[in-house]
Structures are given as structure tokens and as C-alpha cells.
């Protein structure tokens, strides 16, 4: 058995990013499901796996938002298919703001009730993203146990933990992860569909 990297690129150079989005999403979901379905509670395993679960899920969110932003930049002809399509930014909240400002343009043909429902859903999603962003704004929080102010240039820096004591309800985490996955997969699929329609007509 073997894995391949960049063996396919896709018409818009989207394939490798697609695989990363899928991979981090599935990795976080499968690890969490492993903990939730275990016959016996293993506290050491829970406390060790929570880090890769949260890191992978946070990175999934960052990637799926960036991928959707890139799709809309292709749709709006702001970029070509051989260009990256999103800025260097790790704050999920800042990325979400960029995406939200674009997706509201899709509401122009919606009726008032549908627009209100979309806005309610957006607010709910934003509140969850704020919570994640407050914990880990720049994608370091679940990669290291300590704050690395100078990126390890001084080995004698005093230890400062990333977080105080945290208790995480795994069932609640699973529920919120599912909500965010369903929401952002829907947004991403919508952007892919719009882009596909535009490029099909062009051909």
C-alpha cells in the first residue's frame, strides 16, 4: 500500500486542498468517535487524544473556509486557477468575516424568511467560531503545551502553559463539531456548484 501527494491537481488546482480538508475533518471525527464509543473509559487516552482532535478540527475549519474563499475568488474572477486565492491568515474569525461578507451576496434572490433563517444560522456559527478563536487564535494552542513566545530561541524561557485547567464535554464537542461540519460543507459545496456552472457554460 502507498499514498500519493499531488498525483492529481484538478482543473482549478483544487485537489490537494480538497484532500487536506477531507483528511483533517475525518481525522478529528474518527478520533473523537473512538473515544465516545469505547467500551471502557481510558482517561489517559482521552487526555492525550483531545489535543490532536482539537488541532485537526480547528485546522479543518481554517482550510475549509480558505477553500471556500478561494472558490468565490475564482467565481468573481479575482484570481486565476494557478493562483493561491487566499491571504496568509490563521485567525478563524477573520477568515469567517471575509467569507460571510461574500456569501451574503448570495441572499439577493432569497425571500425574507429564508434570509432571516440564514442570518440566524450565521450568528450561531459565528458564536461557536468566537469560542474556538478565543481559545486558539493562531493555531498554536493545541500543537504545544507551553506558550512559545520567542519560538524556542531561548531554551531557558520560563514555562507558561497555553491553557489553565480545561474540562471538555466530549458529547457536546461532538454535537458542535457536527453542526460546524454540516454548515461549512454546505457552503463549500455551494461554491463548488456555482463555480462548476460558470466554467461549464464558459466551455
Outline where the language-model segments fall.
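Domain-scale activation on soluble regions of proteins
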Residues: 1-203
Amino acid at each position: 500500500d502507498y499514498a500519493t501527494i499531488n498525483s492529481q491537481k484538478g482543473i482549478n488546482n483544487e485537489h490537494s486542498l480538497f484532500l487536506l480538508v477531507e483528511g483533517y475533518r475525518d481525522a478529528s471525527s474518527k478520533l473523537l468517535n473512538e473515544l465516545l464509543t469505547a467500551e471502557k473509559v481510558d482517561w489517559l487516552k482521552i487526555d492525550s487524544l483531545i489535543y490532536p482532535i482539537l488541532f485537526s478540527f480547528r485546522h479543518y475549519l481554517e482550510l475549509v473556509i480558505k477553500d471556500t474563499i478561494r472558490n468565490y475568488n475564482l467565481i468573481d474572477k479575482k484570481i486565476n486557477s494557478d493562483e493561491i486565492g487566499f491571504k496568509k491568515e490563521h485567525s478563524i474569525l477573520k477568515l469567517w468575516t471575509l467569507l460571510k461578507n461574500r456569501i451574503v451576496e448570495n441572499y439577493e434572490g432569497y425571500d425574507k424568511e429564508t434570509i432571516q433563517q440564514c442570518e440566524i444560522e450565521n450568528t450561531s456559527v459565528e458564536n461557536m467560531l468566537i469560542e474556538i478563536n478565543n481559545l486558539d487564535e493562531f493555531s498554536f494552542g493545541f500543537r504545544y503545551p507551553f506558550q512559545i513566545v520567542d519560538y524556542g530561541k531561548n531554551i531557558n524561557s520560563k514555562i507558561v502553559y497555553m491553557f489553565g485547567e480545561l474540562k471538555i464535554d466530549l458529547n457536546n464537542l461532538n454535537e458542535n463539531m457536527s453542526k460546524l461540519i454540516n454548515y461549512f460543507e454546505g457552503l463549500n459545496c455551494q461554491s463548488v456548484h456555482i463555480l462548476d456552472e460558470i466554467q461549464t457554460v464558459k466551455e
